[in-house]
Protein backbone atom coordinates (compact mmCIF):
# COMPACT_ATOMS: atom_id res chain seq x y z
CA UNK A 1 0.00 0.00 0.00
CA UNK A 2 2.75 2.46 0.96
CA UNK A 3 4.65 1.63 -2.23
CA UNK A 4 1.54 2.22 -4.35
CA UNK A 5 0.97 5.58 -2.68
CA UNK A 6 4.59 6.58 -3.17
CA UNK A 7 4.50 5.63 -6.86
CA UNK A 8 1.19 7.42 -7.32
CA UNK A 9 2.64 10.54 -5.72
CA UNK A 10 5.74 10.35 -7.92
CA UNK A 11 3.80 9.92 -11.15
CA UNK A 12 1.39 12.72 -10.27
CA UNK A 13 4.21 15.19 -10.88
CA UNK A 14 5.46 13.68 -14.12
CA UNK A 15 3.67 14.69 -17.30
CA UNK A 16 2.50 11.56 -19.10
CA UNK A 17 3.18 12.84 -22.60
CA UNK A 18 5.77 14.82 -24.51
CA UNK A 19 5.00 18.26 -25.85
CA UNK A 20 4.23 18.76 -29.53
CA UNK A 21 5.39 22.20 -30.77
CA UNK A 22 3.25 22.09 -33.93
CA UNK A 23 0.18 21.28 -31.85
CA UNK A 24 1.17 24.03 -29.41
CA UNK A 25 1.33 26.54 -32.25
CA UNK A 26 -2.16 25.57 -33.41
CA UNK A 27 -3.54 25.76 -29.88
CA UNK A 28 -1.81 29.13 -29.32
CA UNK A 29 -4.10 30.74 -31.90
CA UNK A 30 -6.69 31.00 -29.12
CA UNK A 31 -4.14 32.92 -27.02
CA UNK A 32 -3.14 35.45 -29.69
CA UNK A 33 -5.69 38.17 -28.87
CA UNK A 34 -4.10 38.79 -25.46
CA UNK A 35 -0.62 37.27 -25.65
CA UNK A 36 0.21 37.64 -29.36
CA UNK A 37 0.58 34.76 -31.82
CA UNK A 38 4.20 34.26 -30.80
CA UNK A 39 3.74 35.06 -27.11
CA UNK A 40 4.83 38.70 -27.41
CA UNK A 41 1.84 40.44 -25.88
CA UNK A 42 0.97 43.86 -27.25
CA UNK A 43 -1.48 44.62 -24.44
CA UNK A 44 0.41 46.00 -21.40
CA UNK A 45 -1.66 44.18 -18.76
CA UNK A 46 -0.90 40.74 -20.22
CA UNK A 47 2.42 38.92 -19.83
CA UNK A 48 4.94 38.20 -22.52
CA UNK A 49 4.97 34.40 -22.77
CA UNK A 50 7.70 34.13 -25.41
CA UNK A 51 10.89 32.70 -23.92
CA UNK A 52 9.24 31.94 -20.59
CA UNK A 53 10.29 28.68 -18.96
CA UNK A 54 8.09 25.79 -20.12
CA UNK A 55 7.79 24.39 -16.61
CA UNK A 56 6.53 27.72 -15.26
CA UNK A 57 4.02 28.13 -18.10
CA UNK A 58 2.70 24.60 -17.61
CA UNK A 59 2.29 25.12 -13.86
CA UNK A 60 0.52 28.46 -14.35
CA UNK A 61 -1.93 26.95 -16.83
CA UNK A 62 -2.55 24.12 -14.39
CA UNK A 63 -3.04 26.59 -11.52
CA UNK A 64 -5.53 28.63 -13.58
CA UNK A 65 -7.42 25.46 -14.50
CA UNK A 66 -7.50 24.16 -10.92
CA UNK A 67 -8.40 27.53 -9.38
CA UNK A 68 -5.13 28.17 -7.54
CA UNK A 69 -4.57 31.28 -9.66
CA UNK A 70 -7.33 33.62 -10.70
CA UNK A 71 -7.61 35.93 -13.69
CA UNK A 72 -11.05 36.53 -15.23
CA UNK A 73 -9.73 36.51 -18.80
CA UNK A 74 -8.00 33.15 -18.28
CA UNK A 75 -10.86 31.25 -16.65
CA UNK A 76 -12.78 30.45 -19.85
CA UNK A 77 -9.56 29.78 -21.75
CA UNK A 78 -8.29 26.96 -19.54
CA UNK A 79 -11.44 25.04 -18.64
CA UNK A 80 -11.19 22.60 -21.53
CA UNK A 81 -7.40 22.31 -21.70
CA UNK A 82 -6.03 18.82 -21.18
CA UNK A 83 -2.64 18.11 -19.65
CA UNK A 84 -1.35 17.50 -23.18
CA UNK A 85 -2.75 20.86 -24.35
CA UNK A 86 -0.99 22.63 -21.48
CA UNK A 87 2.30 20.87 -22.21
CA UNK A 88 2.06 21.74 -25.91
CA UNK A 89 1.27 25.39 -25.22
CA UNK A 90 4.01 25.70 -22.61
CA UNK A 91 6.67 24.25 -24.91
CA UNK A 92 5.50 26.32 -27.88
CA UNK A 93 5.66 29.64 -26.01
CA UNK A 94 8.94 28.71 -24.31
CA UNK A 95 10.48 28.11 -27.75
CA UNK A 96 9.51 31.59 -29.02
CA UNK A 97 11.90 34.54 -28.90
CA UNK A 98 10.86 37.45 -26.69
CA UNK A 99 10.94 40.81 -28.47
CA UNK A 100 12.02 44.02 -26.77
CA UNK A 101 9.05 45.91 -25.40
CA UNK A 102 8.40 49.55 -26.24
CA UNK A 103 9.17 51.10 -22.87
CA UNK A 104 11.24 54.10 -21.88
CA UNK A 105 12.43 53.42 -18.38
CA UNK A 106 13.19 56.25 -15.99
CA UNK A 107 16.92 56.04 -15.14
CA UNK A 108 16.45 57.05 -11.50
CA UNK A 109 13.71 54.46 -11.04
CA UNK A 110 15.84 51.79 -12.71
CA UNK A 111 18.71 52.56 -10.31
CA UNK A 112 16.41 52.42 -7.28
CA UNK A 113 14.78 49.24 -8.61
CA UNK A 114 18.16 47.56 -9.11
CA UNK A 115 19.13 48.49 -5.53
CA UNK A 116 15.84 47.13 -4.13
CA UNK A 117 16.20 43.93 -6.19
CA UNK A 118 19.63 43.43 -4.63
CA UNK A 119 18.24 44.12 -1.14
CA UNK A 120 15.43 41.58 -1.39
CA UNK A 121 17.62 39.05 -3.24
CA UNK A 122 15.45 38.69 -6.35
CA UNK A 123 18.19 36.90 -8.28
CA UNK A 124 18.36 34.11 -5.72
CA UNK A 125 15.31 32.66 -7.45
CA UNK A 126 14.92 34.56 -10.73
CA UNK A 127 18.67 34.30 -11.48
CA UNK A 128 20.96 36.98 -12.89
CA UNK A 129 19.31 38.96 -15.63
CA UNK A 130 15.96 37.80 -14.23
CA UNK A 131 15.96 34.95 -16.76
CA UNK A 132 14.10 32.49 -14.53
CA UNK A 133 14.52 28.76 -14.11
CA UNK A 134 12.16 25.79 -14.01
CA UNK A 135 9.09 26.96 -12.09
CA UNK A 136 10.55 30.41 -11.43
CA UNK A 137 9.45 32.81 -14.19
CA UNK A 138 11.55 34.86 -16.54
CA UNK A 139 10.51 38.40 -15.65
CA UNK A 140 13.12 40.34 -17.63
CA UNK A 141 11.47 42.39 -20.32
CA UNK A 142 7.92 42.03 -19.02
CA UNK A 143 5.80 45.15 -19.43
CA UNK A 144 5.88 47.37 -16.33
CA UNK A 145 2.08 47.36 -16.04
CA UNK A 146 2.11 43.57 -15.75
CA UNK A 147 5.00 43.53 -13.25
CA UNK A 148 3.22 46.12 -11.10
CA UNK A 149 -0.07 44.20 -11.28
CA UNK A 150 1.59 40.95 -10.15
CA UNK A 151 3.70 42.50 -7.38
CA UNK A 152 0.60 44.25 -6.03
CA UNK A 153 -1.34 40.98 -6.18
CA UNK A 154 1.38 39.20 -4.18
CA UNK A 155 1.47 42.08 -1.69
CA UNK A 156 -2.33 42.03 -1.30
CA UNK A 157 -2.22 38.23 -1.06
CA UNK A 158 -4.71 37.93 -3.91
CA UNK A 159 -2.14 35.89 -5.82
CA UNK A 160 -0.89 33.02 -3.70
CA UNK A 161 0.21 30.25 -6.05
CA UNK A 162 3.89 30.84 -5.28
CA UNK A 163 4.41 28.63 -2.21
CA UNK A 164 4.70 31.84 -0.19
CA UNK A 165 8.04 33.11 -1.46
CA UNK A 166 6.82 36.07 -3.54
CA UNK A 167 4.04 36.81 -1.09
CA UNK A 168 6.63 37.09 1.70
CA UNK A 169 8.96 39.30 -0.32
CA UNK A 170 6.10 41.54 -1.45
CA UNK A 171 5.23 42.32 2.18
CA UNK A 172 8.63 44.02 2.55
CA UNK A 173 8.31 46.41 -0.39
CA UNK A 174 6.49 49.72 -0.69
CA UNK A 175 4.32 51.03 -3.53
CA UNK A 176 7.30 53.12 -4.67
CA UNK A 177 9.52 50.03 -4.57
CA UNK A 178 7.00 48.21 -6.77
CA UNK A 179 7.11 51.00 -9.36
CA UNK A 180 10.92 51.12 -9.22
CA UNK A 181 11.25 47.34 -9.51
CA UNK A 182 8.92 47.42 -12.52
CA UNK A 183 11.10 50.02 -14.24
CA UNK A 184 14.21 47.97 -13.55
CA UNK A 185 12.78 44.58 -14.56
CA UNK A 186 11.12 45.99 -17.67
CA UNK A 187 14.39 47.61 -18.76
CA UNK A 188 16.11 44.20 -18.91
CA UNK A 189 16.00 42.02 -22.01
Residue spans for each PLM region:
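Protein kinase-like catalytic domain
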Residues: 35, 65, 126, 155, ...
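Gly/Gly-Pro-rich "capping" loops immediately C-terminal to redox-active cysteine motifs
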Residues: 39-69, 75-81, 114, 118, ...
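Sec-dependent N-terminal signal peptides
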Residues: 4-13
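C-terminal capping alpha-helices of c-type cytochrome domains
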Residues: 79-101, 145, 171-189
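Sequence/structural segment immediately N-terminal to covalent heme-attachment motifs in c-type
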Residues: 20-38, 101, 105-128, 143
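Sec/Tat signal peptide C-region and signal peptidase I cleavage site
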Residues: 14-19
Amino acid sequence: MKRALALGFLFAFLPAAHADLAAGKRKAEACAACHGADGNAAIPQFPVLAGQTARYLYLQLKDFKEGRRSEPAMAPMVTKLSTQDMLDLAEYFAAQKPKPIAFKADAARVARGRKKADEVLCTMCHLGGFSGQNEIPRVAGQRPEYVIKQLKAFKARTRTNDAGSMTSVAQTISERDIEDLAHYISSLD
